[in-house]
Amino acid sequence: MYRLLAPAKINLFLQIIGNCLDGSGYHELVMVMQAVSLMDRLELIPRRDREIKVHCTNPAVPCDQRNLAYKAAALLQQHFPDRDGVEIFIEKRIPLGAGLAGGSTNAAAVLVGLDLLWQLGLTQGELQTLAAQLGADVPFCLQGGTALALGRGEQLTPLADLQGLTVILGKYRSLSVATPWAYQTYRQEFAATYAQTPSEQEKARQEGGSAILLQAIQQHDIAPLAANLRNDLEKVVLPRYPLVAELKEQFLAAGAIASMMSGSGPTVFALAPSADEGYRIMQRVRRALPDPDLDLWVCECCPHGIQLETS
């Protein structure tokens, strides 16, 4: 039996360059991803048959073949058909449909856990290759920390960690944004601005502002980091979901050094220089927005990906 901790992720930077030139239908992206200390907890127990069973504390999570944790186990079973099944228990703390990679981080945890449980001896590179088959965010969730992600998100470069920086998360429980809708709507509205050739895409990458952010991360310089956050998907999500736009404004009004929507939303994150200030900001936002449907968390930037839970 293995217990694992699976961190959520936020996007500090999300630039849509254009369509991938391989004809896959995906977008070419420049992202800076950050793991945070809001974590799901997974427990993997071996079975004596070939079945994969998933259980979750959140009844809204599908526990069948639609679940990414299930898909991760099934993928490993395809590669290692002599292995038995597994019972997967997910204690869900990361909200659903939130732009926080909750499903992807569960899949990454299953890859790590089954590598140990089944004594597969997979290298980090082999785990990353499997992760990329499951979804664009799964390779990052495996690695965690702070990383530059190119392509669909699978081309990862580790960056200096941002330990000590506090992150406040806010999400309306009843609100979710479908990631495919966000990207498809962006394509419909902004396709005319897409970089069409390799040279155009490289130029867009160079001019998109990520270099300033990367330098700020390297130097742990919070002011230019906060000033150079970017999420292109805000252009389509915020007009459609005014609650998300208002939450971002309230974080800034409460004293956050920066605030932005994460991924395709609807989660909004804010940055604070300390945990004490993070809790003060959370309390101010709670007073300004007393809606019981709004969940708020204070967490830290996390320097790692999937970890074994030590008792």
UniProtKB/Swiss-Prot annotation:
<comment type="similarity">
    <text>Belongs to the GHMP kinase family. IspE subfamily.</text>
</comment>
<feature type="active site">
    <location>
        <position position="137"/>
    </location>
</feature>
<dbReference type="GO" id="GO:0016114">
    <property type="term" value="P:terpenoid biosynthetic process"/>
</dbReference>
<keyword id="KW-0418">Kinase</keyword>
<dbReference type="InterPro" id="IPR013750">
    <property type="entry name" value="GHMP_kinase_C_dom"/>
</dbReference>
<dbReference type="Pfam" id="PF00288">
    <property type="entry name" value="GHMP_kinases_N"/>
</dbReference>
<dbReference type="InterPro" id="IPR036554">
    <property type="entry name" value="GHMP_kinase_C_sf"/>
</dbReference>
<feature type="binding site">
    <location>
        <begin position="95"/>
        <end position="105"/>
    </location>
    <ligand>
        <name>ATP</name>
    </ligand>
</feature>
<keyword id="KW-0547">Nucleotide-binding</keyword>
<dbReference type="GO" id="GO:0019288">
    <property type="term" value="P:isopentenyl diphosphate biosynthetic process, methylerythritol 4-phosphate pathway"/>
</dbReference>
<protein>
    <recommendedName>
        <fullName>4-diphosphocytidyl-2-C-methyl-D-erythritol kinase</fullName>
        <ecNumber>2.7.1.148</ecNumber>
    </recommendedName>
</protein>
<dbReference type="InterPro" id="IPR006204">
    <property type="entry name" value="GHMP_kinase_N_dom"/>
</dbReference>
<feature type="active site">
    <location>
        <position position="9"/>
    </location>
</feature>
<dbReference type="GO" id="GO:0050515">
    <property type="term" value="F:4-(cytidine 5'-diphospho)-2-C-methyl-D-erythritol kinase activity"/>
</dbReference>
<dbReference type="InterPro" id="IPR004424">
    <property type="entry name" value="IspE"/>
</dbReference>
<keyword id="KW-0414">Isoprene biosynthesis</keyword>
<dbReference type="Pfam" id="PF08544">
    <property type="entry name" value="GHMP_kinases_C"/>
</dbReference>
<comment type="function">
    <text>Catalyzes the phosphorylation of the position 2 hydroxy group of 4-diphosphocytidyl-2C-methyl-D-erythritol.</text>
</comment>
<dbReference type="GO" id="GO:0005524">
    <property type="term" value="F:ATP binding"/>
</dbReference>
<comment type="pathway">
    <text>Isoprenoid biosynthesis; isopentenyl diphosphate biosynthesis via DXP pathway; isopentenyl diphosphate from 1-deoxy-D-xylulose 5-phosphate: step 3/6.</text>
</comment>
<dbReference type="InterPro" id="IPR014721">
    <property type="entry name" value="Ribsml_uS5_D2-typ_fold_subgr"/>
</dbReference>
<keyword id="KW-0067">ATP-binding</keyword>
<keyword id="KW-0808">Transferase</keyword>
<dbReference type="InterPro" id="IPR020568">
    <property type="entry name" value="Ribosomal_Su5_D2-typ_SF"/>
</dbReference>
